[in-house]
Amino acid sequence: MTTSDPDLSGLETDVCVVGGGATALYGALLCARAGQSVVLVFSQPEFEAAGAGISPLLAPPTLGLLAASGIDEQLTAAGRKVLGVDDHGSTGMLSSWRYADHAGIARPYGLTVPTGTTVQALLAELRAQPRATVLTGEGVVSVEQDDERVVLGFERAAGQDGGVPARRRVAARYAVAADGRQSALRDLVGIRLEVSAFDRPAWLLVAPDVPGRESVLLVRHRAPRALFTIPTPGPSSAVVWAPDRDQEKQLEQGGPAELAEQIKEVDPELSEWLGTVGGRTSPVMRLGFSLWRAPSWRVGRVLLVGESVHGLHTLGGQGLNQSLQGAASAARAIGEALASGDPAAIEDYERVRRPHVERLQDLQWNLQALGYGTAPAVKGAHEDFIDVMTALPPELVAQLDGSDTRA
């Protein structure tokens, strides 16, 4: 159900989800399918279009969760399978693994999918739920809560037409802040992020695939330089280059041709290919990276989910993976709390998920390939945390309502 009926200026529901990305939509969908009434409120007038956005890597456990939601066919049709990682150092191969090598993984590949495609697939499923209401063009501006419920106040966003009420109140048993790093709902409940910025930027270029290469994530680490090549739909590749400090200014000024020249020593085949397809690449984009945490994942009846409460380096696509898995954990906790009347399940959401997410953050923060260290790499960039990404602790699997630690 989707509505902008001005008569609905006051709503009561089991769960109110604030946000409009894949994390918010997925959490709302799980709650609705579990039998709860759900109101999702997005501050923007429109959701991201299918095919739009970046194409992060969805890991096998996340794909298993999304497949159970009925959107597997859409994701597979629009996405690109990634079979594993080959990681090269200055003296040769540091590590090589495939998802299929990890015993028990039901789905032996990751999938890079445009974020807009995931959003639209989840949105269609959510709108089909009889107890779900989707509202757009309204920003959260107030929150009040007691032991029984939380009341959220919304205002019509600038530029919205009169079909949306100027103000609206939604009373819910629980609320979910899934509105991203700049979360308005998180700010309203008084939670501030603790941000740690990586001191090393990188530069992104999207180009057609080098012919004949296997669909794996390639890492070439020639300290302090590092090159990451990620298969994306197209077929194309996202080329992420972290140069030495003294190469950065030249890269800012030189664009794709300069990037191709700089990587010649690290990946001569790709360098030559970029020269061949120079008119078919994207512009070069500078990327900055950071991690962020929050001192608490919950304030009373408001739960913080996804990038509203944690952020990771883009390496391996773990930001979206952990956000979607967090939405599943939160939805399960809310369902148990509503069914039993016992808020202990809400406390378990943070207790079980938080150590897993922060372990990934710590591994990324200390990863040699993401810094300016000049010592030759002795381990693959993904080697230390492939198991953390794919083999989930049993208690976390139970919270996700899965049946296998390597779903």
Swiss-Prot record:
Gene3D superfamilies xrefs: FAD/NAD(P)-binding domain
EC number: 1.14.13.215
Keyword match Transmembrane helix: no
Cofactor binding mode and count: Requires a flavin cofactor. Displays no significant preference, and FMN, FAD and riboflavin can all be used efficiently.
One family name in Pfam for this protein: FAD_binding_3
Activity regulation description: When flavin concentration is low, activity is enhanced by the presence of the NADH-dependent flavin reductase AsuE2. In the presence of abundant flavin, activity of AsuE1 is not affected by AsuE2.
Stored InterPro entries: FAD-bd, FAD/NAD-bd_sf, PheA/TfdB_FAD_monoxygenase
Top EC class for this record: oxidoreductase
Keyword terms of this UniProt record: Antibiotic biosynthesis, FAD, Flavoprotein, FMN, Monooxygenase, NAD, Oxidoreductase
PANTHER family according to UniProt: 3-(3-HYDROXY-PHENYL)PROPIONATE/3-HYDROXYCINNAMIC ACID HYDROXYLASE (PTHR43476), BLR0106 PROTEIN (PTHR43476:SF4)
Protein name, UniProt field: Protoasukamycin 4-monooxygenase
Gene: asuE1
